[in-house]
């Protein structure tokens, strides 16, 4: 027996080509407007000092990915997601706007504790990227790294904001908080070939895969660092 909904859908069949064309035009217009709006937002945020403490990943999603062909903001989320087992307990350090926790990790993790020292970043994350198994809170990991034991700790696109001494000290605390089979994952940027920083506000940019690996080897038996290369940058 046909339901009222199925009858309505059948009767509207004659209008399907028109509706598809209409909504396709609407979708393209929305895409064009969203790209332009996020491009303008990017220019305002990163073209005028002071520079922000975190990157709004909607800029990457709606504008930068298509405009530049650079998808490293996506590869970061995917690489850490691949290290997770279903139901895992996750600590995300320096979470920024919360994009990765919501778009990537929340679907697989049992619980996620995401922290950042910037109250503006945490407020943004709570407004835009909330999920039932994600908790956002303000914390400076140099002095107040969350306690507990975690299956995964993610330090994504943030290690470069710390000095070499701070990185070494933080690695000790990270290791203490991982389970016996726990995994630390993350992403960072390589300095320019002439030794100059890619971004001036970074404390330390790594020179090579080996330069990054030296911070891990005192604490982990299994260390894997790989490089992805884009026209304007190299990532680890």
What are the language-model segments listed below?
Residues 157-158:
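Short catalytic micro-motifs in class I SAM-dependent methyltransferases
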Residues 2-86, 91-145, 162-169, 173, ...:
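Class I (Rossmann-like) S-adenosyl-L-methionine-dependent methyltransferase catalytic domain
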Residues 154:
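A conserved beta-strand element that flanks and buttresses the S-adenosyl-L-methionine
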Residues 87, 150-151:
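Local beta-strand N-terminus motif with an aromatic residue
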């Amino acid at each position: 027996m046909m339901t009222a909904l199925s009858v309505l859908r059948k009767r509207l069949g004659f209008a399907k080509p028109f509706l598809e064309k209409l909504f396709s035009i609407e979708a393209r217009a929305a895409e064009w407007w969203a790209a332009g709006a996020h491009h303008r937002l990017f220019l305002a945020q990163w073209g005028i000092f002071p520079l922000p403490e975190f990157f709004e990943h909607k800029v990457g999603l709606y504008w930068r990915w298509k405009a530049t062909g650079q998808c490293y903001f996506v590869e970061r989320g995917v690489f850490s997601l691949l290290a997770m087992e279903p139901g895992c307990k996750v600590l995300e350090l320096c979470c920024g706007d919360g994009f990765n926790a919501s778009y990537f990790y929340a679907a697989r993790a049992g619980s996620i504790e995401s922290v950042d020292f910037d109250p503006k970043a945490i407020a943004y994350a709570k407004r835009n990227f909330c999920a039932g198994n994600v908790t956002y809170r303000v914390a400076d990991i140099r002095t107040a790294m969350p306690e507990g034991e975690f299956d995964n700790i993610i330090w994504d696109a943030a290690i470069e904001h710390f000095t070499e001494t701070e990185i070494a000290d933080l690695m000790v605390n990270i290791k203490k908080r991982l389970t016996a089979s726990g995994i630390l994952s993350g992403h960072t940027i390589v300095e320019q070939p002439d030794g100059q920083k890619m971004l001036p506000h970074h404390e330390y940019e790594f020179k090579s895969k080996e330069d990054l690996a030296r911070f891990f080897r005192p604490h982990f038996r299994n260390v894997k660092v790989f490089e992805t290369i884009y026209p304007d940058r190299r990532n680890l």
